[in-house]
Amino acid sequence: MVSLRMHELPVNDQPRERLARLGAGALSDAELLAILLRVGISGTNVLQLAQQLLGEYGGWIGLQVADYNDLCRRTGIGASKAATIKAALEIGRRLARSSVEERYPIRSPGDVAALLMVEMSHLDQEHLRTVLLDTKHRVQQINTVYIGSLNSATIRIGEVFKEAVRRNSAAIIVVHNHPSGEATPSPEDIQVTRQLVAAGRLLDIEVLDHLIIGRGQYVSLRERGIGFE
């Protein structure tokens, strides 16, 4: 079967024209990515290139966490296209986060997971983040406190609460990921949780929960009654 070059497709079937006519929501993932890429390479039109990229990287999430330099080296991409992809995905990530941060209170562990799981479940190192909340449990700020192997010996309690004290936060939620993809709490996770809960009581900043994020899954230690006895 002979594949058509992009300019050989009927005008109404080309991604930009379809977007103008039907709106961005009507486009497939490959069509949206093709608009960012703009042009293909010899023998592969831009829509085919977009389909290949999404397949190779496992969709948008894979492209979001992909190394920029690796993308640059991919045939048909290069620095300019890689930068465009990364910038567009970062805009989407910030938009998704800001809509939750600015408008909605956190009511459940699922709300926090929805805010952070897509990004954190694919990190290749452990990250510990704090979600700072006001008196109505609206998100004030999200901070990355630590990157790397986390245990009770390396975590300084003061660092975890530093921004919460500065922002006069009413509560925090602690979130960290397991790069292995398994969200089961370790003994170290439980010990750290107990230390943080105790420190929060002294500082009058409630630790509402500690979430562990794995690959497409999360565990709420509060829901399991672990570390919050």
From Swiss-Prot:
InterPro entries: MPN, RadC_JAB, RuvA_2-like, UPF0758, UPF0758_CS, UPF0758_N. Disulfide bonds: none annotated. GO terms for biological process: proteolysis. Zn(2+) binds at residues 176, 178, 189. Pfam families: RadC, UPF0758_N. A motif (JAMM motif) lies at residues 176-189. Residues 105-227 form the MPN domain. This is UPF0758 protein Cagg_0777. GO terms for molecular function: metal ion binding; metallopeptidase activity. SUPFAM superfamilies: JAB1/MPN domain, RuvA domain 2-like.
